[in-house]
């Protein structure tokens, strides 16, 4: 099984790269490392397909310091209607369908250097762009 990135995850990453061409990518990622493989993580390939349903986007988008929070918040709001999004984690908070996409404390890894975005199986083959104002959509 060869791991591959969800089409929706790939589309969103491309949109972010286009909107922020000079952004820092040091904390970007999608495929889990050995630390992830021992845990339940959307960075691990799903069996039997091999799809990876998560991306990390570095919080330094190359512009105003609050751009990452703005992006995370727009993703949170979009999650209310776009069922391709499973959850968003950023800066010690998580938003998901639990509590209808309201931010709540996250007690796992703090995610202060990057935004974690997980996708549902609905996004596996869906290449539609995400309608986010910060990305010019």
Cite the ranges covered by each PLM segment.
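Secondary-structure transition/turn motif
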Residues: 105, 119-121
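Intrinsically disordered, low-complexity N-terminal regions enriched in serine/proline/glycine
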Residues: 86-89, 105, 129
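Low-complexity, Gly/Ser/Thr/Pro-rich intrinsically disordered linker/tail segments
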Residues: 3, 121-137
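Short proline/glycine-enriched turn/loop segments at secondary-structure junctions
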Residues: 103-109
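Short amphipathic beta-strand/extended segments with alternating polar/hydrophobic composition
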Residues: 97-102, 129-131
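Short glycine/proline-enriched turn or capping motifs at secondary-structure junctions
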Residues: 109-113, 126
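Secreted/periplasmic proteins that engage bacterial cell-wall peptidoglycan
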Residues: 1-100, 112-119
